[in-house]
């Protein structure tokens, strides 16, 4: 489906997705994909805030999708925009070269923009990174200096207790997208271990392509059920705190204020 996307598809679909976000109370969203100039246009026309980036994907079969240079130019075009701000969207440690991630980290520190990436989301990723680099995602991110940028890490399901301690030193932002990741057969992230260590956790919807909808209130309901199951205690997780943090902490992480949804 991704290979079939073109500019017209994106422009027709973005207002629908943004409208669904607004209906569930979201006034600021993040998106890392293709044709993000179209996403920016749609956000301006509707009047919501957005934090956007082209998605850099290099290590897969087919032509690469965008580059760090393209991403930099896109971010520069948004510097004076009152509604739309740039992100640095490198897809993942398994689909982008180490060199590009290091360049993205330099750009992040120099421009004050967050890196966004998928992180520790599947057992296949863990296996691939061990085979390629001899390290887990957390070990790899620490080794190359990625964690110093305090990136936005989507999912972060397969992280050991020892690695949570490593993350706690840097306090990256964790995007928790429960419905999508569980529907793929991946595990349930131990969100309380992050929260207890002071690592900011933000609710996300992932996308209409993978989740089927983008309703942050639905994701809060799934989070409550999933975390209750994970810890075998239905009152273990506070959904009100999760929503509150998603608004306050999430909005601040983007540099555009309150009202975040990924």
Each model region followed by its residue ranges:
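Alpha-helical scaffold segments that flank or form the walls of functional sites
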Residues: 1-47, 70-80
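Divalent metal-coordination and catalytic microenvironments
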Residues: 25, 43, 88, 118, ...
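Structural detector of well-ordered beta-strand residues that form the stable sheet scaffold
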Residues: 29-30, 51, 116, 152-154, ...
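Metal-coordinating catalytic core of metallo-dependent amide/deamination hydrolases
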Residues: 38-157
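Catalytic core of soluble alpha/beta enzymes
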Residues: 121-145, 149-169, 182-193, 207-218
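His/Asp/Glu-enriched, well-ordered alpha-helical/loop segment
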Residues: 143-150, 192-262
